[in-house]
Amino acid sequence: MKKENFLKQFPKEQEYLASKLYNYYEIAQDYEIISFTEKFYTPNFWKKLGKKFGGVNIICDGVFKDSDRRQIAFVPDGFVDGNNNFGFENNESDLENFGINRNELQFPNKLLKISIDSRFREYLHKDFLGSLMGLNVRRELMGDLILENDKKKWICGYIPVSEKISDYIVSELKQIGKAVCEIEIVDVKNKNDLPKYRYDDKLIIVPSKRLDSIVSTITNLSRTKVIHPIEKGKVFVDYVEEKDKSKLLEIGSLITIRGFGKYKLFLDKGETRKGKERILVKKYI
């Protein structure tokens, strides 16, 4: 695929990241080697690539199960037994089934665990990300952030970062806000031991999967009142600003509503007797 055709799949404001992504694809295709991105890409990128792109297999890894931000590996067919395609997750058994040597697929990332004493105040995602980005670290070089409380009443932030900046962060990050922090690199061999996302489940009933209908039901605002935040760019679908109130969403879509949080359309639960759609929505907490 030519570069200009590839870039047409993405909004103009994402052309820089899309251009970098194409370069990795080109390396894998031209030199028949596995090519890894250093950056973590959001779903609006890796969903478009699918399982195979331009004759090259696609594997994504964000360390955590169901992660949003993922590094991408472009894997030529020469590294695969048979004509198998790949899914988005790459656990050990999957790699064996597809004939891939685990040592050939070491994504260039490290998982950091950042711990602080939270007995005296509450610390949020924005506190951790603010301190990390205060080191002049770009957001796209970091994956998803998951917070967990430990038995000592400390709060721990787990975040995968590009391998090239991991030592720098370990050396330079001294505190989160005004709280002194401890930081370490975590072994990710056993993914069952890694922290998991926490959700609040909500069953919504909507006339259709139109954006304004779903946002209205999630926020308990009228459809008239949600038009303003949508048109003002306060609603994102798969991390992309979406101003089209009539856009039809799909199961698996991520919706971020400023002031209300992030949600995933998780499962289609069928229709009501009156023909309305029942959808299981998960809110990230």
PLM regions with names:
Residues V215-S216, S222, K234, I251:
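Internal, well-folded beta-alpha domain core
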Residues M1-D212, I218, E241, L248, ...:
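Ferredoxin-like alpha/beta domains used as RNA- or RNAP-binding modules
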Residues P229-I230, L249:
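Short, well-ordered loop/turn sites that connect or cap secondary structure elements
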Residues K232, F260-K262:
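A generic structural motif
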Residues V237-Y239, R258:
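Short strand-turn-strand beta-turns centered on an Asx-Gly dipeptide
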